[in-house]
């Protein structure tokens, strides 16, 4: 822990919140951990630079309950790594599968809408939140949505290609809303697709252009 590193992470979260619903939840364990008290202190200091963003402090265990009982309360959450690892896996239950969730490890704030980064972009790491699944490797049944959405985050946050990112997200939303699913999220009445079939559908919608 260092004040500089906490401030960097919290500032990225404020920038994200400023471009979204202007609401930021900061999670900690300040009631039992000195590091939690430091986290909250630094978050309050950074908040002075973002008067337009509502900062809400919450203990991590309380947040764990509310993520399940009232997930719409949250938009942008900022917390330290060990708490974030736990809560991000918990949040995946809401979507029905870890195969639905992308992730981005950012070193700085994303470019605002309408601003492109250029060909080289900005270094960051994008990947699904799940790890490897060797037990289903080669069976063509994995959910590729998290991989597609990770690519969308890359276009949006490293390159500022917001329209292109929207095309990927809109294609996925269209397919899922029409009842096409991989087996991990499919119900009895849904059209069950393999990994490659889901990929072909997404690619087909994107190649046909925005509607």
PLM regions: where:
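A domain-level signal for the structural core that forms small-molecule/cofactor-binding pockets
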Residues: 5, 67-68, 97, 207
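A structured beta-alpha segment of the ubiquitous adenosine-cofactor-binding alpha/beta core
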Residues: 55-74
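Glycine-rich phosphate/nucleotide-binding loop
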Residues: 68-180
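Flexible, glycine/charged-enriched surface loops at secondary-structure junctions
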Residues: 19-28, 50-58, 160-169, 177-188
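Glycine-rich phosphate/diphosphate-binding loop of Rossmann-like nucleotide-binding domains
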Residues: 1-61
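Short, conserved micro-motifs enriched in small and acidic residues
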Residues: 3-7, 33, 138-145, 193
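Phosphate-binding loop/pocket of nucleotide- and phosphate-handling active sites
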Residues: 190-211
């Amino acid at each position: 822990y260092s004040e500089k590193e906490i401030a960097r992470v919290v500032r990225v979260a404020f920038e994200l919140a400023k471009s979204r619903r202007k609401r930021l939840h900061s999670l900690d364990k300040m009631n039992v951990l000195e590091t939690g008290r430091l986290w909250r202190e630094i978050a309050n200091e950074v908040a002075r630079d973002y008067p337009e963003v509502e900062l809400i402090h919450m203990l991590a265990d309380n947040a764990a309950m509310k993520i399940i009982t009232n997930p719409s309360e949250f938009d942008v959450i900022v917390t330290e790594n060990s708490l974030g690892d736990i809560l991000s896996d918990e949040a995946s239950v809401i979507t029905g599968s870890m195969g639905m969730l992308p992730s981005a490890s950012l070193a700085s704030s994303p470019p605002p809408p309408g601003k492109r980064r250029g060909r080289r972009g900005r270094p960051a790491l994008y990947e699904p939140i799940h790890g490897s699944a060797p037990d289903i490797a080669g069976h063509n049944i994995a959910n590729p949505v998290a991989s597609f959405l990770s690519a969308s985050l890359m276009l949006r946050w490293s390159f500022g290609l917001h329209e292109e990112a929207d095309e990927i997200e809109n294609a996925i939303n269209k397919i899922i809303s029409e009842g096409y699913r991989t087996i991990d999220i499919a119900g009895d009445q849904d059209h069950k697709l393999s990994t490659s079939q889901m990929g072909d559908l997404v690619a087909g919608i994107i190649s046909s252009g925005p509607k």
